[in-house]
């Protein structure tokens, strides 16, 4: 036998590895292990005196929990994957395996760095591209691709590792990386959650999945550069030409594109880009390549655009007729008129071979379009000479490329010679409306503006601010006129983003379009002439100074100059623009207008103005001015307009749809209509309509809550949410409402928590002023930092964020909330919101109620109807209410949910199911020593049980008219009047607001019958019954008799027949089937019965201490019990659905000891089996209820109405009615202490020839009803007690003896 010493036993107990791990600090906040000191070698010991972190996880293959304090870490690169270990305070190394999923994101950058070091150590000559490809494969489990930004976070670790490892120090990438010392940069595919909300971010916008889908839908518009016909980083023109261009030389360097010649800063300064052709409305004819005016507003247009929505080419009418070679002059003139009218589809939309249209869904019938002339082919009709690859034997060069155009082939037809260097035809096909002389002038102006010396000289030469302003404008405008210009708004850059700072608008004048292209050079020439003229005006300086002093001081003039929006007086105007650009106003120089020499006071005041302007006008203030609020983000042009919608596309698509519709109305064929307007255009225009509708809502309807899709939760629903949520709050917690609206939630929560003795903190955020300012802060939720709130272990966040399109805003608000790691998130969000358990966050769904907010649960703030009443919002698809708990709090919160019946399986379930569960839970509530029934006082408030029963009746779609019998006639109140006395405002448990409720009381919810029917038709509410604990409080000095268990409280009937006999009892008190009601209301001598939330009802009690049988059943007739309509039979399905109540009751009272037991079933023929199917219900004697119903004789309401079907006992079936006399029939099944079970309806009284009341002259009480199944006899008779029963008369009350 092998013995193990103590040291080896200790080794077995030491954890060797940790899985599902994470690290936390003393505040139980997750931290990265990289913050610990690193131990590079065995010789180098780490000082463990510093504060360490706690390692949490599982060890021993996940079987044992792990909780260790660690002080250092190390890594090992010798294996296939980097291995990380941490050193405990006991100097034991623990290897780290797989981290917890939510913790993996926190240490992702460390893992990327270690994988990089390992790869570069083994491959010193590896390139940067090879590194990222390797890391992408190794770390593909993470959503974010590895990048240089991950290494920047640990540049110190990389530098130290390179010092200690020779192979790593020889890595080319490491040398370049450490030499360059890079900083974090924005990556094209990097996601930034704040971009959708904060316009001021310097980072570029990253499209969401939905935006990428929109880009795919938008690809049928041109997506290649108009100069080089290649893709890449392109800038789209906002005008009608629908073209795109490479903006910088770098963007077009792969295809040797001349590009637009901008630099990166200039591109970022562009808001909306219009090419020079669209800016001046001077376009090229796609056939002859000559420029011509396209401005048809003055009737002088020369070129006209093709009407197709996706075609941006212009044509001279005579060029089209000449190309088509129409021999008939009349046909040519008709075609020209059609072209001028804007109803012409160019030859590009017909195959040059078969002259048929395009079918994009069929690859063979897709078009191959030439980029130099209006010629197209179907793929199947493409000539052999237009090849996708070089054929050297036949001297055929590549003329076709697939994949550059959406569902099309890009070709150069044989009419265009291919340049061997460019591999495309000569690129002289794009002409802008400016001359070569202007290009030279613009280059000179650019050189001067970019030179510091040039700028200083310009400032010395131009002293007049008016002249300086006009010269600046002229230079700027001449620069923009020579290059593709920009306008206010946003650029449509296909794969990039520009700054959001708007450009200043410039006023222009429209001119004759026929001479626009001749006037551009004149502007620069006349500007220079004005500058020279300004230099000659120095002779009048003294006169101007004297005149200025005599009229107004220089400081006032300067102040008025800075305040005036247009300080330059209009003089001569050089018109150089069109619809998009308006003309500059250049003031001619007036004598004496030059600024005189400044005195000391003026200089001081001027410097003060400059200093103030420098302090106040900063980039931060400008960005803040144009900042878009969070709830407006889905309506901003950054998210909607700039990427997919341009003015040219919208106008062209609308015009195409109108033309196509006109063609169809005039009898044209569908093919011609499709050539004008493709099916994809119709789909796209509908998407644009939806997007623009959302975007324009704040402008069309004002900046109101509803314009941003906001709606508020009704206070009644908020109160019910508070009643659920307050159980989870602890002292010192902080309740955060990140979109508080009217700020009702925190107020209600505060009142509830104060009532329960808890003190919490509150933070409420919104962009709009709240109705009340209880801890309210008008602030964007996206700007809230962790320093402003408590630690996550004390945070409870919610509740109703703005939804946004496809829950986009809800997802953003939740993502922001997860940064604080609150212990609880309670949310009202649409169903399409991304679930927290699908995110990489450690949150567990505690419960979810999908029907709680159905119906009119919301209202529209500030909106009223014609009666000045608040408009309510009815949800077609109600948003679920859900409560999420952080994983380390989940067990605690689940226990709270179970205790208060909040779990998902309970929330939103039907009343019937809840009552059944409560009944099953209360079958045997007492121990063996407490088995006697007379120790259990059992009385229930009548109205309360009537509430529960009535709700169940409503859920079964049975129209009921209930009558609540009281001991006194004055106590017969209808349910509606009773509720009016109590007040209508109740919390979720049915209690009146502002009143406390005893913990042992039963939760119930009271509504009017119509409200019940409406609520239950939408979603059944839960009837929650609390089970009281068995304490000494259950015993009372005034004891109820054991017979009180037969008390019945309510008489419910759909109809009550008019009988000639009065009932002995007006209504029998009924017991509930749940144990929770036991001992709640104890009947005492000369006292009142307390009901849950109900007014006290006085009862006449006899003087005896022990409750007798007489005082239970002695009732007085009431007017409400008489003169009502005949009763209609219950449906069998109703009794079947409720039979389980009696099963629970029978088990309950059949198991309390020898004093009570259920009767033995009688012998029945074989045709009466005990139970032969789930839908056929039997009582304990085996009688089927399939025959139940009302026979020829009707049951009078004077007997208290038909008893509650749940509470009434069943009779024997018709088969036994005439077989034996009444008493003999039941004799074999009784003993002295047992009663036979009664019918579901009260017993039929003996008929009397006259009178309206069935009198009981001896005032004997009626026999008590034993517990029963829910069956009845067609005749309604029920057996009486054993005649030998000591408390009753010999007849058992059936006759007056």
Curated annotation (Swiss-Prot):
A motif (Nuclear localization signal 4) lies at residues 979-986. The keyword Cell membrane does not apply. Zn(2+) 1 binds at residues 237, 241, 275, 278. InterPro entries: Cytosine_MeTrfase1_RFD, NSD_PHD, PHDvar_NSD, Znf_PHD, Znf_RING/FYVE/PHD. Residues 526-547, 969-990, 1096-1109 have a biased composition (Basic and acidic residues). A motif (Nuclear localization signal 2) lies at residues 492-499. Residues 475-487 have a biased composition (Low complexity). Residues 471-547, 562-598, 969-1017, 1085-1109, 1260-1297 are annotated as: Disordered. Its main location: nucleus. Zn(2+) 2 binds at residues 285, 288, 316, 319. Coiled coil: none annotated. A zinc finger (PHD-type) spans 222-281, 282-352, 351-417. Disruption phenotype: Impeded use of distal polyadenylation sites at intronic heterochromatin (HC)-containing genes (e.g. histone demethylase gene IBM1) resulting in a lack of functional full-length transcripts. Abolished expression of At4g16870, a transposable element (TE) of Copia-like retrotransposon origin, associated with methylated status. Strong reduction in RPP7 levels due to altered H3K9me2 levels in COPIA-R7. Disturbed expression pattern of NLR (nucleotide-binding, leucine-rich repeat) defense genes due to abnormal H3K9me2 hallmarks; some being repressed, including RPP7 and RPP4, but many being induced. GO terms for molecular function: DNA-binding transcription factor activity; histone H3K9me2/3 reader activity; histone reader activity; sequence-specific DNA binding; zinc ion binding. Zn(2+) 3 binds at residues 306, 311, 346, 349. Keywords: Chromatin regulator, Developmental protein, DNA-binding, Metal-binding, Nucleus, Phosphoprotein, Plant defense, Repeat, Transcription, Transcription regulation, Zinc, Zinc-finger. A motif (Nuclear localization signal 3) lies at residues 610-617. A motif (Nuclear localization signal 1) lies at residues 445-452. GO terms for biological process: defense response to fungus; epigenetic regulation of gene expression; leaf pavement cell development; negative regulation of heterochromatin formation; positive regulation of defense response to oomycetes; positive regulation of flower development; regulation of defense response; regulation of DNA-templated transcription. Phosphorylated by WNK8. The PHD domains recognize both active and repressive histone methylation marks at the intronic repeat elements in genes. Interacts with WNK8 in nucleus; this interaction is involved in developmental processes regulation but not in RPP7-dependent disease resistance. Interacts with EML1 and EML2 in nucleus. Component of the ASI1-AIPP1-EDM2 (AAE) RNA regulatory complex composed of at least AIPP1/EDM3, ASI1 and EDM2 and may contain CPL2, AIPP2 and AIPP3/BDT1. Binds directly to AIPP1/EDM3. Co-associates with AIPP1/EDM3 to histone H3 lysine 9 dimethylation (H3K9me2)-marked chromatin and transcripts at a critical proximal polyadenylation site of RPP7 to hamper proximal transcript polyadeylation/termination. This is Protein ENHANCED DOWNY MILDEW 2. The gene is EDM2.
């Amino acid at each position: 036998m092998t013995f193990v010493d103590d040291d080896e036993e200790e080794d077995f107990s030491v954890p060797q590895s940790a899985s599902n791990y994470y690290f936390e600090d003393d505040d139980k906040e997750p931290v990265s292990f990289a913050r610990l000191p690193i131990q590079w070698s065995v010789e180098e010991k780490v000082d463990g005196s510093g504060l360490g972190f706690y390692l949490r996880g599982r060890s021993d293959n996940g079987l044992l929990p792990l909780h260790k304090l660690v002080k250092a870490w190390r890594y090992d690169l010798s294996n296939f994957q980097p291995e990380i270990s941490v050193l405990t305070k006991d100097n034991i190394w623990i290897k780290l395996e797989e981290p917890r999923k939510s913790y993996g994101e926190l240490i992702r950058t460390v893992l990327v760095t270690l994988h990089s070091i390992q790869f570069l150590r083994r491959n010193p000559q590896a390139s940067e591209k090879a590194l990222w490809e390797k890391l992408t494969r190794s770390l593909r489990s993470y959503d974010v691709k590895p990048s240089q930004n991950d290494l920047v976070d640990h540049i110190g670790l990389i530098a130290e590792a390179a010092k200690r490892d020779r192979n790593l120090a020889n890595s080319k990438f490491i040398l370049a990386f450490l030499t360059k010392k890079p900083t974090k940069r924005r990556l094209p595919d990097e996601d930034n959650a704040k971009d959708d909300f904060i316009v001021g971010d310097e980072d570029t916008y990253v499209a969401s999945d939905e935006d990428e889908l929109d880009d795919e839908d938008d690809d049928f518009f041109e997506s290649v550069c108009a100069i080089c016909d290649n893709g890449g980083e392109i800038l789209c023109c906002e005008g009608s030409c629908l073209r795109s261009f490479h903006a910088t030389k770098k963007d077009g360097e792969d295809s040797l594109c001349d590009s637009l010649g901008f630099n990166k800063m200039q591109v970022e300064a562009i808001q909306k880009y219009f090419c020079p052709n669209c800016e001046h409305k001077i376009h090229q004819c796609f056939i002859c390549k000559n420029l011509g005016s396209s401005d048809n507003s003055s009737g002088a247009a020369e070129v006209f655009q093709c009407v197709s929505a996706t075609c941006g080419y212009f044509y001279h009418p005579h060029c089209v007729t000449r190309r088509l070679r129409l021999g008939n002059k009349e046909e040519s003139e008709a075609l020209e008129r059609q072209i001028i009218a804007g109803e012409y589809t160019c030859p590009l939309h017909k195959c040059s071979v078969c002259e048929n249209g395009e079918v994009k869904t069929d690859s063979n019938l897709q078009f191959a379009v030439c980029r130099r002339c209006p010629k197209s082919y179907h793929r199947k009709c493409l000539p052999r000479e237009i090849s996708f690859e070089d054929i050297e034997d036949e001297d055929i060069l590549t003329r076709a490329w697939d994949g550059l155009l959406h569902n099309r082939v890009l070709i150069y037809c044989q009419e265009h010679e291919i340049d061997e260097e460019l591999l495309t035809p000569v690129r002289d096909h794009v002409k802008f409306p400016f001359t070569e002389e202007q290009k030279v002038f613009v280059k000179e102006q650019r050189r001067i503006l970019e030179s510091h010396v040039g700028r200083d000289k310009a400032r010395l030469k131009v002293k007049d601010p008016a002249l300086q302003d006009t010269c600046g404008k002229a230079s700027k405008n001449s620069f923009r006129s020579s290059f593709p210009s920009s306008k206010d708004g946003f650029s449509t850059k296909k794969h990039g983003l520009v700054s959001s700072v708007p450009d200043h608008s410039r006023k222009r004048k429209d001119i004759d379009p026929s001479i626009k292209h001749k006037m551009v050079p004149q502007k620069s020439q006349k500007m220079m002439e004005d500058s020279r003229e300004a230099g000659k005006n120095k002779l009048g300086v003294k006169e101007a100074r004297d005149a200025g002093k005599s009229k107004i001081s220089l400081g006032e003039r300067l102040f008025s100059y800075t305040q005036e929006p247009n300080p330059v007086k209009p003089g001569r105007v050089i018109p150089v623009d069109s619809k998009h650009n308006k003309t500059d106003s250049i003031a001619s120089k007036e004598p004496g207008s030059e600024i005189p020499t400044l005195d000391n006071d003026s200089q001081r005041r001027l410097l003060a103005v400059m200093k103030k302007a420098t302090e106040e006008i900063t980039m931060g203030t400008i960005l803040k001015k144009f900042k878009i609020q969070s709830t407006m983000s889905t309506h901003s042009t950054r998210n909607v307009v700039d990427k997919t919608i341009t003015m040219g596309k919208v106008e062209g698509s609308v015009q195409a749809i109108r033309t196509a519709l006109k063609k169809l109305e005039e009898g044209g064929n569908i093919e011609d209509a499709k050539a004008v307007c493709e099916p994809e255009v119709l789909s796209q225009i509908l998407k644009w309509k939806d997007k623009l509708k959302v975007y324009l809502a704040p402008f069309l309807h004002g900046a109101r809550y509803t314009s941003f899709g906001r709606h508020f939760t009704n206070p009644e629903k908020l109160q019910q949410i508070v009643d659920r949520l307050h159980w989870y709050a602890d002292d010192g917690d902080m309740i955060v409402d990140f979109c508080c609206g009217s700020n009702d939630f925190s107020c209600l929560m505060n009142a509830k928590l104060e009532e329960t003795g808890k003190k919490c903190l509150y933070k409420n955020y919104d962009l709009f002023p709240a109705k009340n300012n209880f801890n309210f802060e008008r602030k964007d939720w996206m700007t809230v930092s962790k320093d402003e709130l408590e630690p996550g272990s004390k945070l409870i966040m919610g509740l109703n964020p703005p939804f946004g399109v496809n829950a986009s805003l809800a997802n953003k608000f939740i993502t922001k909330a997860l940064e604080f790691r609150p212990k609880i998130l309670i949310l009202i969000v649409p169903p399409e919101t991304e679930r927290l358990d699908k995110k990489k966050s450690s949150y567990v769904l505690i419960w979810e109620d999908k029907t709680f907010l159905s119906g009119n649960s919301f209202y529209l703030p500030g909106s009223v109807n014609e009666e000045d009443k608040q408009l309510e919002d009815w949800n077609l698809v109600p948003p679920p209410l859900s409560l999420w708990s952080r994983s380390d709090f989940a067990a605690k919160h689940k226990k709270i949910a179970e205790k208060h019946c909040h779990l998902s399986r309970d929330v939103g379930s039907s009343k019937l199911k809840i009552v059944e569960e409560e009944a099953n839970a209360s079958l045997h509530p007492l121990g063996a020593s407490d088995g006697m029934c007379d120790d259990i006082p059992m009385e229930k408030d009548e109205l309360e049980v009537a509430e529960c029963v009535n709700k169940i009746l409503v859920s079964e779609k049975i129209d009921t008219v209930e009558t609540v019998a009281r001991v006194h006639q004055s106590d017969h109140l209808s349910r509606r009047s009773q509720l009016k006395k109590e007040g209508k405002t109740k919390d979720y448990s049915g209690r009146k607001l502002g009143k406390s409720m005893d913990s042992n009381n039963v939760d119930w919810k009271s509504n009017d019958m119509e409200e019940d029917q409406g609520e239950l038709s939408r979603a059944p509410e839960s009837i929650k019954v609390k089970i009281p604990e068995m304490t000494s409080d259950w015993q009372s000095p005034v004891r109820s008799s054991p017979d009180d268990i037969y008390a019945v409280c309510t008489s419910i009937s759909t109809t009550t027949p008019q009988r000639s006999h009065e009932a002995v009892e007006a209504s029998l008190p009924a017991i509930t089937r749940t144990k929770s009601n036991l001992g709640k209301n104890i009947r005492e001598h000369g006292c009142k019965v307390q009901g849950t939330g109900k007014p006290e009802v006085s009862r006449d009690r006899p003087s005896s201490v022990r409750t007798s049988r007489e005082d239970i059943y002695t009732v007085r007739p009431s007017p409400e019990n008489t003169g009502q309509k005949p009763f209609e039979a219950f449906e069998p399905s109703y009794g079947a659905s409720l039979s389980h109540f009696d099963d629970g009751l029978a088990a309950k009272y059949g198991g309390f000891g020898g004093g009570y037991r259920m009767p033995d079933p009688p012998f029945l023929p074989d045709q009466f089996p005990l139970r032969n199917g789930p839908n056929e219900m039997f009582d304990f004697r085996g009688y089927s209820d399939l025959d139940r119903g009302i026979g020829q004789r009707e049951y009078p309401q004077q007997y208290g109405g038909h008893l509650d079907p749940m509470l009434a006992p069943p009779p024997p079936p018709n088969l036994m009615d005439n077989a034996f006399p009444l008493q003999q029939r039941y004799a074999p099944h009784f003993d002295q202490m047992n009663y036979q079970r009664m019918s579901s309806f009260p017993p039929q009284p003996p008929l009397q020839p006259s009178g309206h009341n069935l009198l009981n002259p001896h005032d004997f009480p009626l026999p008590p009803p034993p517990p029963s199944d829910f069956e009845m006899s067609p005749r309604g008779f029920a057996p009486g007690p054993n005649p030998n029963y000591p408390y009753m008369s010999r007849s058992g009350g059936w006759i007056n003896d």
